[in-house]
C-alpha cells in the first residue's frame, strides 16, 4: 500500500531543494536532550558577518557528521536521523559579541572503537575551513563511558609508576638535558649522570634530539643508560631518563624502543607530532613491555594557543589519556610557556581525575567519567627554577613531574649542584606543607631557611631569585578573571 501523498511530499520537497540551510536539514534541534551515550563537543565559533549563529552551529554539526553542501538522495539509504549530529544549544561568549559557544551531540555509532584518528577525522577534519565561519575552536568534549572503555588508556599510570620507582608523598623531579642540540654522546651522558646523582629522579631528551650527525641515537642511548645505572648505584634510588624514540617511520621507532628496553630503560619518549595512530601504537608496545611512555607535546602551540581558532589543549589532554600516554607536558603557569593558572589546572584535572566535574572557571564544560582508565602523570616544564617551588606545589600538588632544565643545568656551581638545589627545595617545601604551614605565602621564607645549610640552593636563589615570566596569557577562562599564582 502506498504512503499518503502528504507523507511522500515532504521528502520529495527536501530532495528537490538542491541546497538547504543546515538547520532545515535537521542539524539543529533546540529541544534535543543529549543522551548518556552521546559524544558531546563544544565549539567556540565566530560566524561571518550576517550569518545566523544557529545556522553556523548547524553547519558545524553537519560538516562534522553526515552533511555536504547539497542535499543527497542517498541519505534515504541510511538511518540519517540518527547519524546526523545535532547542534542543540548556542550561547554567547561572555564579553565577546562576535563569538558563540555551540554544543553538538553525536551518536556513538558514528565513531570507530578505540581510534583517536577516526574521532579527530570527524570532529576536526573539515569544519575549521568552512567559509561561513570566520574561526572555530574545539573547546571541550565529553565521551560516553561506553566509548571510553574501548580504549586501553595509560599502560602504567601514576600509582604503578610510583610503585616501580618506590617514591611517594612528593612530586617527582626531572630535567631536560641542555643544550638540546650539539652535545656528543659522551658529554650528553655526563650531563645525565650529574643531574641524577644530584637528586633528580629523571633526565630527559628534548623534543628535537633524535639522531643527528653530532650524536647518533644509539650512542646517546648507550651513554645515557650507563649514566642512569651509575647514578642509581651511587644513590640507591631508581632513576630513569626519557629516551626519545621519535623517528621517521614506525618501524624505526619500534627498533629504537626495543634497544632502549634491552639496555634496561624503564621509560621511552615520543613527540606529539608523530600523530595519533603512532601514539596509540607506541602505547600498546609500552603496555606489552612494561615501559612508561612519556609524551612531549611538541607542536601543540600551533593549534592550541589562540583562543579563537584551533583546539584547546584540554581536548588534546583528553585524547592523549584515551590514547594511552603515561606522562604528558601540561604547562607550568609560572614558567616561560603559555598558561593561565586556572586553565592549566583544568588540564591537570583531566589527567588525574577519576571523574572530572564541570568547572567553568577552569575551562571544563562537561562532566567526564573516566571509567577504569589509569591516570596520567602531568609534567610541568619550561622556565621554572627552585625559587618557584612553593608556587608549583601549591598549584599542582604531589602527582606531577617538575622538570627544571635550565634551572638545573644553568646553576652557577654546576649540574649536580643545580639538581641538589631543586631536591632540597622540594624536600623543604613538602616538609613544611606536611607540618601545616602556608607554603604559598611562607614559601620564600621556607626556601631561605633551607638555603642556610645548602650552598647549592642558596646559589640558585641568589641567581634566579623570584624570576617569573609575567606575560598576559592568551588562552584564559571566559568565566573567571585571570588568576595570579602569587
Swiss-Prot record:
<dbReference type="InterPro" id="IPR020888">
    <property type="entry name" value="RuBisCO_lsuI"/>
</dbReference>
<dbReference type="GO" id="GO:0016984">
    <property type="term" value="F:ribulose-bisphosphate carboxylase activity"/>
</dbReference>
<protein>
    <recommendedName>
        <fullName>Ribulose bisphosphate carboxylase large chain, plasmid</fullName>
        <ecNumber>4.1.1.39</ecNumber>
    </recommendedName>
</protein>
<feature type="binding site">
    <location>
        <position position="297"/>
    </location>
    <ligand>
        <name>substrate</name>
    </ligand>
</feature>
<keyword id="KW-0456">Lyase</keyword>
<feature type="active site" description="Proton acceptor">
    <location>
        <position position="178"/>
    </location>
</feature>
<keyword id="KW-0614">Plasmid</keyword>
<keyword id="KW-0503">Monooxygenase</keyword>
<feature type="binding site">
    <location>
        <position position="329"/>
    </location>
    <ligand>
        <name>substrate</name>
    </ligand>
</feature>
<dbReference type="GO" id="GO:0000287">
    <property type="term" value="F:magnesium ion binding"/>
</dbReference>
<feature type="site" description="Transition state stabilizer">
    <location>
        <position position="336"/>
    </location>
</feature>
<keyword id="KW-0479">Metal-binding</keyword>
<feature type="binding site" description="via carbamate group">
    <location>
        <position position="204"/>
    </location>
    <ligand>
        <name>Mg(2+)</name>
    </ligand>
</feature>
<dbReference type="InterPro" id="IPR036376">
    <property type="entry name" value="RuBisCO_lsu_C_sf"/>
</dbReference>
<dbReference type="InterPro" id="IPR033966">
    <property type="entry name" value="RuBisCO"/>
</dbReference>
<dbReference type="GO" id="GO:0019253">
    <property type="term" value="P:reductive pentose-phosphate cycle"/>
</dbReference>
<feature type="binding site">
    <location>
        <position position="206"/>
    </location>
    <ligand>
        <name>Mg(2+)</name>
    </ligand>
</feature>
<dbReference type="InterPro" id="IPR020878">
    <property type="entry name" value="RuBisCo_large_chain_AS"/>
</dbReference>
<dbReference type="Pfam" id="PF00016">
    <property type="entry name" value="RuBisCO_large"/>
</dbReference>
<feature type="binding site">
    <location>
        <position position="176"/>
    </location>
    <ligand>
        <name>substrate</name>
    </ligand>
</feature>
<keyword id="KW-0113">Calvin cycle</keyword>
<keyword id="KW-0560">Oxidoreductase</keyword>
<dbReference type="GO" id="GO:0004497">
    <property type="term" value="F:monooxygenase activity"/>
</dbReference>
<feature type="active site" description="Proton acceptor">
    <location>
        <position position="296"/>
    </location>
</feature>
<keyword id="KW-0460">Magnesium</keyword>
<comment type="subunit">
    <text>Heterohexadecamer of 8 large chains and 8 small chains.</text>
</comment>
<feature type="modified residue" description="N6-carboxylysine">
    <location>
        <position position="204"/>
    </location>
</feature>
<dbReference type="InterPro" id="IPR017443">
    <property type="entry name" value="RuBisCO_lsu_fd_N"/>
</dbReference>
<feature type="binding site">
    <location>
        <position position="381"/>
    </location>
    <ligand>
        <name>substrate</name>
    </ligand>
</feature>
<feature type="binding site">
    <location>
        <position position="207"/>
    </location>
    <ligand>
        <name>Mg(2+)</name>
    </ligand>
</feature>
<feature type="binding site" description="in homodimeric partner">
    <location>
        <position position="126"/>
    </location>
    <ligand>
        <name>substrate</name>
    </ligand>
</feature>
<comment type="similarity">
    <text>Belongs to the RuBisCO large chain family. Type I subfamily.</text>
</comment>
<comment type="function">
    <text>RuBisCO catalyzes two reactions: the carboxylation of D-ribulose 1,5-bisphosphate, the primary event in carbon dioxide fixation, as well as the oxidative fragmentation of the pentose substrate. Both reactions occur simultaneously and in competition at the same active site.</text>
</comment>
<dbReference type="Pfam" id="PF02788">
    <property type="entry name" value="RuBisCO_large_N"/>
</dbReference>
<feature type="binding site">
    <location>
        <position position="180"/>
    </location>
    <ligand>
        <name>substrate</name>
    </ligand>
</feature>
<dbReference type="InterPro" id="IPR036422">
    <property type="entry name" value="RuBisCO_lsu_N_sf"/>
</dbReference>
<dbReference type="InterPro" id="IPR000685">
    <property type="entry name" value="RuBisCO_lsu_C"/>
</dbReference>
<keyword id="KW-0120">Carbon dioxide fixation</keyword>
